[in-house]
Design a protein with these regions (language model features):
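N-terminal signal peptide c-region/cleavage motif recognized by signal peptidases
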Residues: 16-18
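Positively charged n-region of N-terminal signal peptides that target proteins for export
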Residues: 1-5
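Bacterial N-terminal signal peptides
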Residues: 8-14
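Tandem repeat scaffolds
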Residues: 20-111
Length: 111
């Protein structure tokens, strides 16, 4: 019984870790090009990153740390920012059309 519980605990931990992690290839694409449409960046550390005018349409940024990031003029249409940290993030002129915000609300700005 004790072994079964240990196996189940390890399996659940592995599943939870993989379910909340970003795709490293997508993060590399973003870092190399500044664009990443429909990318999986959930939980990514993007603090103080310059993403000025980046194309992040449809990106999954759920739980991402965007504190202090520059998202001026970025296209975040249909992106998911639920649970993301946007403290001190610059978003002037960003497209937020059908975008899920950190609190779960959906806004339609710049459509």
């Amino acid at each position: 019984m004790k072994r079964t519980l240990t196996v189940l605990t390890v399996a659940a931990t592995m599943f939870a870790s993989s379910a909340s992690a970003f795709d490293p290839d997508d993060l590399q694409i973003l870092r190399n090009t500044g664009d990443c449409r429909n990318c999986d960046l959930k939980g990514a550390d993007l603090r103080n990153t310059s993403l000025n005018s980046a194309d992040l349409e449809g990106a999954n940024l759920r739980g991402a740390d965007l504190e202090g990031a520059n998202l001026r003029g970025a296209d975040l249409g249909a992106a998911n920012l639920e649970g993301a940290d946007l403290a001190f993030t610059q978003m002037n002129g960003a497209i937020l059309c059908n975008t899920t915000m950190p609190d779960g609300s959906v806004i339609y700005s710049g459509c």
